[in-house]
Amino acid sequence: MSPKILISGPPRSGKSTLMKMLTDYFRKDYSIVGFLTPEIRKNNKRIGFDIKSIDSTIRFPLARKATIVDTHRLGDYSVFVEKFNNFIEEYLENKIRDFGTPNESHILFIDEIGKMELFSNRFEIFIRNIFRLDMSIIATIGKNLSHSIRSYLMNLPEICFFETSIDIQRDIFNEIVKNFS
């Protein structure tokens, strides 16, 4: 069975940094696909998040601090669900199909399974389906996420769960790498 890794931790605990370290490490020996959600900052203040493909130049806004009509809202953020749905359909689902039969040389990275991303029903369905495949997955999940997808994933027998913090980031990196050797 291919490794399925979930990484959790409070905001600013280094989850996304750990994912970046892992994509950089695995890129040389594996076919990797997926996305990161880098913070967007202006004048040292976070103004939003982007979706950034890890194997192409695709990048677009996931959320911005603004009131925009016809968007989902999470706190001060407007979330661009339609753009994310298009990304899932036109990029992620196609990339997984292009892999053909998933094998040990493929890894899917998902940063993150969180409240903003789960405004997309398509994303929830994608997550439920992809975790059923024999495919290696490394994903972050919101620590305080109260959504049925969290309990679904945490109850899968093949899940290897890590809770990170800045202090133990390197140790977790090493443990995750061991899962692939």
Task: For each feature predicted by the language model, list its residue ranges.
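Hydrophobic anchor at the beta1->P-loop junction of P-loop NTPases
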Residues: 7
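Conserved lysine of the Walker
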Residues: 15
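Walker A (P-loop) ATP-phosphate-binding motif of ABC ATPase nucleotide-binding domains
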Residues: 4
